[in-house]
């Protein structure tokens, strides 16, 4: 939840400064030595793909995916990356006079080494890591040889976002808790207590707030696309090996091995290219449900032991630079009034992860009844009024004409509509026909409408669905507007203004790979059982929206911000393109909400 995640990250800095040191530690005996050559994975298990560039950022779990994971979990990750990135950034001495300037209604902000964190490329190929328990709790990290253990054990069948459990034949003491059952997950990690088959972002927030985890390479891996996973559960060691496992929708692959031993130590082994070519992932251990994370440079373990603490410890790797939204927001507010509800941010290079097109992060919420906790982290971003930031990413990713369809059923304006809409949507559960709490309206990441929900062509996904009779349905439109249910969550209409709705249960006769979390698609005919619901069914589970529509704003203030990379200047054509989008966005939003509200995108609104 946002409040929990924010508080967790606030504590990270304190952990790094004072809580992650134990001078009374006692080094335990080394774990049993590996007994194999570097990479014992059978050649037949390797993914049959050439090494090359990763898939287009518009691709992910479904073609046409627009955002990165559940925006409810983004806040903690953004705040953590701000703190961790400070050690990687090198800000210029002083601030130049052109660091921030307005070009018309676009705020141009120059990176001076203060808002963009350089890429942290994966550098553990042909290496081994040993995590040694500390007497005060947690783990220290040191280097060990890169040889994999020869006995791989049994091959297990894992699909995408899948998991298999195995008993541990000894009591493994992990962060002070005995573990005798391990879940080997397809995404390059082992969890204790529960499996992890979620499709949400493989980020630091999930590492911290999820289950206790040994993450040898925590990334979006898909064994069904290539490679094999092996598990050996023996008295001397529990070992899981990912042999040539493909990264989702990418030619990249991962060959890694994680082992843990009766004495409590953990070893992680990494192959070299071409067996290991993935770039975005996390190498770490975490006790789960923790408030602390110590980000470290694991490559330095070759020359020293890295002292950890009672919380998680590890490193996140990314091929691309990272835009620090916290630092950016603070820099923006140093030269602009605190009058904005949202910042809509564009960049002159790609800065989102490989599986991300654009995303939104909610930084404050005072609304009940929409599926979000009430919390306020706006102060972290240098504001009292900011509620949300949207990272649209590189302007070059978007067509010159904002109305041109280019991302599934989406055009640029509907993409903005979805990202802006994540401030309120889509998180609604309801009481179903059995009077049970249901999330059947929800699709991807439980933060978008289901493909099978008649969402009236909402920009928050789903489709407009025509009931053809006889249990047959057809999708007729998509990503055109905010439905009346959307507008209820946004505070623009009363509950009594929301008409009866329906979704289709147990759908059949679908095109291949079509599921609830699929991107909208017009012209799909399928069969199923119609289920009707009313807004009162939503309120029964979520509670009434507070404040009501009578007390909710009708004007949303947004600033369009263009971040220019260090040493570069803002290209006039790029600024003009962003302004063209900005001017088209205002009337699009007005139509999308049936003239019930407007966005104001001028800088210095109200003046």
Q: Language model features by range: what are they?
A:
Residues 1-9:
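Bacterial N-terminal signal peptides that target proteins for export
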Residues 16-19:
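C-terminal motif of bacterial Sec signal peptides marking the signal peptidase cleavage site
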Residues 21-23:
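Bacterial signal peptide processing site
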Residues 27-35:
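Intrinsically disordered, low-complexity proline-rich regions
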Residues 39-328, 485, 542-607:
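Extracytoplasmic Ser/Thr/Pro-rich, glycosylation-prone low-complexity segments
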Residues 169, 178, 314-420, 515-606:
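Zn2+-dependent metallopeptidase catalytic core
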Residues 253-257, 481, 495-528:
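Short linear, low-complexity motifs centered on an aromatic residue
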Residues 409-492:
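The catalytic-center signature of Zn2+-dependent metalloproteases
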């Amino acid at each position: 939840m946002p409040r929990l995640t924010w508080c967790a990250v606030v504590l990270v800095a304190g952990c790094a400064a004072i809580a992650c040191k134990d001078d009374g530690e006692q080094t335990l005996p080394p774990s049993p030595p590996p007994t194999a050559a570097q990479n014992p994975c059978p050649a037949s298990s390797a993914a049959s793909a050439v090494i090359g560039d990763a898939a287009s950022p518009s691709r992910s779990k479904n073609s046409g995916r627009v955002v990165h994971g559940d925006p409810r979990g983004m806040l903690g990750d953004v705040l953590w990356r701000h703190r961790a990135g400070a050690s990687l950034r090198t800000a210029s001495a002083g601030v130049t006079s052109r660091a921030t300037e307005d070009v018309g209604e676009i705020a141009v902000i120059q990176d001076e080494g203060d808002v963009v964190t350089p890429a942290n490329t994966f550098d553990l190929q042909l290496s081994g890591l040993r995590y040694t328990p500390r007497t005060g709790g947690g783990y220290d990290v040191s280097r060990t040889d890169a040889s994999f253990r020869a006995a791989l054990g049994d091959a297990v069948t894992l699909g995408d976002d899948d998991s298999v459990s195995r008993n541990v034949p000894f009591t493994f003491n992990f962060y002070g808790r005995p573990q005798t059952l391990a879940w080997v997950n397809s995404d390059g990690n082992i969890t204790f207590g529960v499996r992890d088959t979620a499709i949400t972002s493989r980020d630091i927030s999930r590492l911290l707030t999820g289950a206790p985890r040994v993450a040898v390479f925590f990334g979006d891996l898909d064994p069904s696309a290539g490679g094999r996973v092996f598990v050996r559960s023996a008295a001397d060691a529990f070992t899981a090996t990912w042999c040539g496992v493909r990264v989702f929708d990418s030619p990249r692959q991962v060959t890694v091995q994680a082992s843990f031993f009766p004495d409590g130590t953990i070893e992680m082994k990494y192959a070299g290219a071409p067996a290991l070519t993935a770039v975005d992932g996390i190498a770490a251990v975490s006790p789960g449900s923790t408030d602390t994370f110590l980000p470290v440079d694991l490559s330095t373990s070759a020359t020293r032991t890295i002292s950890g603490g009672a919380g998680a410890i590890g490193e996140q790797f990314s091929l691309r630079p990272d835009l620090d939204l916290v630092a950016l927001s603070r820099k923006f507010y140093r030269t602009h009034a605190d009058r904005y509800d949202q910042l809509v941010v564009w960049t002159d290079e790609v800065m989102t992860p490989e599986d991300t097109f654009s995303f939104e992060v909610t930084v404050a919420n005072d609304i009940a009844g929409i599926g979000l906790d009430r919390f306020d982290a706006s102060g972290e971003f240098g504001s009292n009024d900011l509620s949300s930031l949207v990272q649209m990413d590189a302007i070059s990713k978007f067509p010159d004409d904002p109305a041109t369809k280019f991302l599934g059923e989406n055009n640029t304006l509907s993409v903005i509509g979805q990202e802006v809409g994540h401030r309120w949507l889509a998180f609604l559960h309801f009481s179903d026909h059995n009077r049970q709490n249901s999330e059947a309206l929800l699709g991807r990441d439980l933060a978008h409408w289901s493909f099978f929900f008649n969402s009236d062509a909402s920009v928050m996904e789903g489709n407009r669905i025509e009931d053809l009779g006889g249990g047959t349905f057809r999708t007729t439109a998509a990503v055109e507007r905010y439905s009346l249910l959307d507008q209820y969550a946004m505070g623009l209409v009363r509950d009594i203004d929301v008409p009866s709705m329906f979704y289709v249960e147990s759908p059949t006769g679908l095109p291949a790979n079509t599921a609830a979390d699929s991107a909208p698609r017009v012209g799909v005919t399928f069969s199923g059982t119609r289920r009707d619901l009313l807004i009162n069914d939503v309120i029964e589970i979520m509670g009434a929206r507070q404040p009501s529509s009578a007390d909710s704003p009708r004007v949303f203030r947004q600033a369009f911000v263009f971040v220019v990379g260090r040493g570069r200047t803002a290209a006039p054509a790029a600024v003009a393109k962003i302004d063209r989008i900005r001017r088209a966005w205002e009337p699009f939003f007005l139509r999308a909400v049936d003239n019930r509200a407007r966005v104001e995108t001028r800088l210095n609104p109200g003046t």
